Design a protein with these regions (language model features):
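Glycine-rich ThDP/TPP pyrophosphate-binding loop and its adjacent helix/strand module
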Residues: 59-185
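Generic low-polarity alpha-helical segments
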Residues: 1, 12, 17-21, 31-33, ...
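Cofactor-binding active-site loop characterized by glycine-rich and histidine/acidic residues
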Residues: 2-109
Length: 185
């Protein structure tokens, strides 16, 4: 069974975001995908190994070991403060210690060149995520610009150039537009 098949529901929650994610990716110097199984349409059809492989020239890092991508983005942001870094993660990763540490550190260091997108589909293996996740969202409040988004429109995003930005995309697992949904280019 392919990995795509195992993660279809996660894949589908990201699908409505494709147009806004493409815009965010195009406007970034580095792109890190911490939820690679949510981005299958961006990979070549024959691409099977997601990881440190750089054969996808416009995705700099994609990890199946969840929780690493934001810390890696932090290192890049420190090393290259004039470069824009885009990171996509799942909401479940906000329960991981290394992700929470990176959020605090990025905010404390005011790494304003990071844009973090969170696929907030409120679902995890143990049930409804919001019951345990809401307190973790407070970790962003002191030093991040928090953008809650339900429209999936790039123009609705209000970035703050003086802070790191986090976009909490309100999605629903396995609910997306018709199967013929087209990416706007």
């Amino acid at each position: 069974m392919s990995c795509k098949r195992l993660h279809d529901k996660s894949y589908n929650s990201v699908k409505p975001l494709y147009n806004v994610l493409l815009k965010l990716i195009q406007n970034s110097d580095y792109r890190l995908i911490g939820k690679p199984y949510g981005m299958y349409d961006f990979y070549p059809k024959d691409y099977n190994n997601v990881g440190l492989d750089s054969s996808i020239d416009w995705i700099d890092y994609a990890d199946f070991t969840l929780g690493n991508s934001l810390g890696i983005a932090e290192g890049i942001a420190i090393a290259e403060p004039d470069k824009k870094i885009f990171v996509l993660i799942s909401d479940s990763q906000l329960n991981m210690g290394n992700t929470l540490e990176a959020i605090v550190s990025i905010g404390f260091l005011n790494l304003k060149n990071i844009i973090l997108a969170v696929d907030y589909n409120d679902s995890c293996s143990k049930g409804v995520l919001s019951e345990v996740l809401e307190p973790n969202l407070n970790i962003f409040k002191p030093n991040w610009n928090i953008i809650y988004n339900k429209t999936y429109e790039y123009n609705d995003l209000k970035f703050d150039k003086n802070k790191p930005n986090v976009i909490i995309f309100d999605t629903i697992k396995n609910v997306y537009p018709k199967s013929d949904y087209k990416i706007k280019v």
